[in-house]
């Protein structure tokens, strides 16, 4: 999926995550995380965001995430929403997304 513009999903409310996805000219995925639970779960959150991007076939993006204690399902949903907005796609392939849940 090609990231064309900057897009945001989520909020800074408790138990949520605000994620910003932007194009990356370096053709890599970079993830910046600000989390109150970074020492405990930072690596897991980064890995979950990265895997979601891979599942969406994103090869180049700058991602900034501000976590306020979001669950995995929320992190994944916010990432999916931000990527689709950044790519300018308003249709979701629910069968494909459901196939990730093995």
UniProtKB/Swiss-Prot annotation:
The modification O-(phosphoribosyl dephospho-coenzyme A)serine is found at residue 14. It is found in: Cytoplasm. Keywords: Cytoplasm, Phosphoprotein. GO terms for cellular component: cytoplasm. Oligomer with a subunit composition of (alpha,beta,gamma)6. Covalent carrier of the coenzyme of citrate lyase. It comes from the Bacteria. It comes from Streptococcus pyogenes serotype M1. This is Citrate lyase acyl carrier protein. Belongs to the CitD family.
